[in-house]
């Protein structure tokens, strides 16, 4: 399962859902006591976002923050990997995340944010899939009642 943006790396994508964009913080971060964040909670924080061009949905969020909320320091990173989650935790930063990642790191807490930003979530696969992969994709689509 992946955050899916059609055309990313030339892949095809089967979108399974649109997930609200949330934020992850260290369980020791001052925001971790909250059950939900507002945009103003992010003022004065480093907000870690994946680099521009990786996902158009994240780029919309980034553009809105740059244009309207200079109080938030956007920190770009190249790719989601374990070092990014560790940096969020040890650096006391805020990381763009989704709720499905609630168990991605034992010292991070995922918090919903009061905004309307979402990101597609699903399966990425070759634009020319093997018959086995295509069969799997169709089976998943059927389970999700997406009808391919």
Question: Which residues are covered by each model-predicted region?
Answer:
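Short beta-strand segments
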Residues: 1-3, 49, 76, 96-98
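Acidic, Gly/Pro-rich loop/turn segments at junctions of secondary structure
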Residues: 1-40, 44, 100-107
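Short beta-strand-to-loop elements that line the ligand-binding cleft
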Residues: 3, 70-81
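Generic structural signal for secondary-structure transition and capping sites
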Residues: 21, 47, 92-93, 145
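Short hydrophobic segments within beta-strands
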Residues: 24, 48-50, 124
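Extended ligand-binding regions for polar small-molecule ligands
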Residues: 35, 40-44, 120-148
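Secondary-structure junction motif
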Residues: 45-69, 133
């Amino acid at each position: 399962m992946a955050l899916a943006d059609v055309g990313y790396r030339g892949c095809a994508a089967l979108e399974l859902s649109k997930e609200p964009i949330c934020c992850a913080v260290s369980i020791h971060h001052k925001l971790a006591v909250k059950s939900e964040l507002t945009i103003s909670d992010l003022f004065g924080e480093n907000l870690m976002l994946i680099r521009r061009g990786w996902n158009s949905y994240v780029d919309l969020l980034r553009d809105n923050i740059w244009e309207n909320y200079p109080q938030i320091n956007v920190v770009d990173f190249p790719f989601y990997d374990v070092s990014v989650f560790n940096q969020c935790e040890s650096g006391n930063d805020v990381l763009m995340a989704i709720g499905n990642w609630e168990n991605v790191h034992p010292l991070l807490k995922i918090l919903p944010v009061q905004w309307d930003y979402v990101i597609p979530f699903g399966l990425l696969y070759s634009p020319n899939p093997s018959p086995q992969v295509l069969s799997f994709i169709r089976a998943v689509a059927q389970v999700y009642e997406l009808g391919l």
